Structures are given as C-alpha cells and as structure tokens.
Amino acid sequence: MSFNDLGVAKWLSESLDAMKIYTPTAIQSACIPAILKGHDCIGGAKTGSGKTIAFAAPMLTQWSEDPFGIFGLILTPTRELALQIAEQFAALGANMNIKVAVVVGGEDFVQQTLALQRKPHFVIATPGRLADHILNSGEETISGLRRVKYLVLDEADRLLSNSFGSDLQRCFDVLPTSDKRQTLLFTATITDAVRALKEKPPTPGKPPVFMHEVETVDKVAIPSTLQISYVFVPSYVKEAYLNSILHLEQFKDSTAVIFVNRTTTAEVLRRMLRKLDFRVASLHSEMPQSERTNSLHRFKAGAARILIATDVASRGLDIPTVELVINFDIPADPDDFIHRVGRTARAGRKGDAVSIIGEKDIDRIQSIEERINKKMELLEDVNDDNVIKESLSATSVAKRESLMEMDKENFGERKKINRKKHGLDKVKPERVTKPKKSKK
C-alpha cells in the first residue's frame, strides 16, 4: 500500500518520498481515504504513529485542487506542538508555495494579525491566542476563518477538557457551521468525551463520522523494549539521586527527558544540573516562547543531552532519539505516565524509564502499575551509599545556589502579573510556586 493508493496527490507522494516516508502507517491507511471521501474523522493512535500526516495529507491533496486561504485551521493545546505541525506542513508543501501561519502565545501579536490578514492557506494555533485575535483584531483579521474547509483538533482529548472550553467556543463561533466544513479529531487517547462525538446524530447531507483507533493505549501501554524501573528515596535527597542516576555507566551518554510536575521544579533542576556540568535544556510555561523554541532546537540538535520538561512536552512533540525518561515527579494520572515514557523505546528501539519515588507516591505508583499491567523493577545500581559518597554534597550546594538565584530574580512573578492583567488570577492552570529558601 502506497500513499498514491490512498488517493494522495502525486506531488505530495513525491514530497513524502523526499522525506523518506514511503509506506503509510496504520492510522494513515485508515483515515486518509475516509477524509478524502468527505467524512468527519476521529483518529486515535499512540504518539509517534504518524497522526499529523494522517490529517495533513488529505488536506493538502484537496487544497492543491483549490488553493485558497484560509483552507484549514489546526488547533493544538501547546505552542511547541503548533510549531512542530507548522514545520511539517511547510516541509510537505515546500514545492507548492504553501503559506502557513502560526498563531500562539509568546509571539508578536501585531505580526500575527498581519499574517492572518494575508489569509495564509493554513493556520496552526492554540485556542487561547486565536480567541484573543477573534476578540481584538477586527473583521479583516478573522474574515479568512469564515471560509475554512477543514478544522483539526490535534490532541483532541486535551482540547475538549474544561480548561479550553470558552476559548474553543469562541473559535468555533467564527468558523463555518459543521455542515459546511470537515472536522478532524486526532488524539493519542480516545476519551469518553471524544468518543461521545461519534454517537451524535449525523449532520444532514454529510457522511457519518469515521472513527479509527489503532492499538489503544490500553493494548500497547508499554513496548516490550522499554525497561521500567524505580528508586525509592526520601524526598529531601531526590536531586542527589537524580545526579547519581545520570552518572550511571548505562545512562551517562544517554539522551534523556526528565519530567516534573511544576515549572518551579523544572527551573531548579535546570540551574542545578548546569552547575553540575550537564548539558541541559528545559521546557515549561514560565519560559518566553523564544527560549522554549531554542531549548527544543538545542535538544534535537544534540547541543543539550538532557531536556527537563513539564507535561507540556509529554504529548505530540517529535523528539525521536530519547534513550532515557526520568520521572522526577510522579504524575497523578496514569495516562500521563504512559505518554511520558512513550518518548523512548520507539520503533523497536530499546529505552529506559526510571521513576524517582517518594513516600507520598505509593498510591500513584500502584495506580500506574495497575494501568500498565506491569510491575516496575528496582534499579539496584544506585543506592544510599553511592549517593552519599558521590553526589549528595555537590548536589546540595548546586541546589541551594539555584534556589537563591531564583529567589533573587523573583522567579514566577511574571506569570502572576500577566494572569492578573488578563483577569485570570483566580484560575489555576499549571501550578507555579515561588521557591522557598533552602534551609541548608
């Protein structure tokens, strides 16, 4: 089966060949023909299965027959994912003079307004920033959205959660009604909210909603090539254990993503590990967009060996060469654990995931093990003796210096000010706390 066999335009098949993408994946083989036949579509497949091309290929095929703007709107929950999707659209349509605009927070608002007024062929946006333009940028800016032929919700399970509700509705209000556009939902996890959309009465004059789920997360939770282990530590020496894990013989040269639950933790670890001579980048919502983009590029290019991230990076981002995932903090939702460790052991490669477990994490670990139907193994190569001997002193000094720097710089204040300015100070999205001064 080739992309030509699925109905993809010849020029696009050639672009895919040039990118060394020769054979459609399961999600692409199922969804591309259905979308080309006019079906609304719900596609579920794990991260790294080619979901972006599953919706991009049919959209670009039909766009090339009638290349107006704005032809397609793709909404995504994170800025990084929006930039990544835009890169793929630009690469696929490079020979066709495709025009793509990215509308996300952290970038120049006026420049985005001008880009929307030029009516690009495709707009990739986060709901919050696009809603801001709809409210504030005038009819000339948003008029192109009223002609959109395709609406895509990527990582639909997150977009359909309550936190995006009002912004999404504001975006939907300026789009053509559902009978005059195709709506495509793609996600790694088909939740009840997503599945319920399939059960709605069909739109008159349109074919029924097509839904295809490839190896749901329940069935392929953990690849057989992924080694899952843990260390059990007192919370006050977690950082020292992290340092020791990164120095283990089997991990000392590995590319690694360290997941944390809070932006403050991400920043503490970034500064601390740099002081300990690790090549580190970080990705969290407290960083300006330019720094986030630069961090991702540094990590992809190998300039940074370690990426420290909140869960903003655990979905969808194309980081194909990760060899080690460390859960410095344990997520409350077992599915978030699955998405995190899904950054490694891809395409049959081996990978490791190590969780640093504290005394308060036992219930979460039990829920995770029940969800993945697998017990974690104790990582015996690191223990109290070698941590105390090799890591504790240097790590404690580096952590203390990092906390003092952050306190001096009022880390976290910018976000509080911005949220108050926009009337959002009573809303609790991603938790940001000002670091406490170290008692050591």
Curated annotation (Swiss-Prot):
Its EC number is 3.6.4.13. GO terms for biological process: endonucleolytic cleavage in 5'-ETS of tricistronic rRNA transcript (SSU-rRNA, 5.8S rRNA, LSU-rRNA); endonucleolytic cleavage in ITS1 to separate SSU-rRNA from 5.8S rRNA and LSU-rRNA from tricistronic rRNA transcript (SSU-rRNA, 5.8S rRNA, LSU-rRNA); endonucleolytic cleavage to generate mature 5'-end of SSU-rRNA from (SSU-rRNA, 5.8S rRNA, LSU-rRNA); rRNA processing. Residues 405-415, 424-433 have a biased composition (Basic and acidic residues). Gene3D superfamilies: P-loop containing nucleotide triphosphate hydrolases. The lineage of its organism: Eukaryota, Fungi, Dikarya, Ascomycota, Saccharomycotina. ATP binds at A45, K46, T47, G48, S49, G50, K51, T52. A motif (DEAD box) lies at residues 154-157. It comes from the Eukaryota. It catalyses: ATP + H2O = ADP + phosphate + H(+). Residues 32-208 form the Helicase ATP-binding domain. GO terms for molecular function: ATP binding; ATP hydrolysis activity; RNA binding; RNA helicase activity. Belongs to the DEAD box helicase family. DDX49/DBP8 subfamily. It is an enzyme of class 3 (hydrolase). SUPFAM superfamilies: P-loop containing nucleoside triphosphate hydrolases. This is ATP-dependent RNA helicase DBP8. Residues 405-440 are annotated as: Disordered. ATP-binding RNA helicase involved in 40S ribosomal subunit biogenesis and is required for the normal formation of 18S rRNAs through pre-rRNA processing at A0, A1 and A2 sites. Required for vegetative growth.
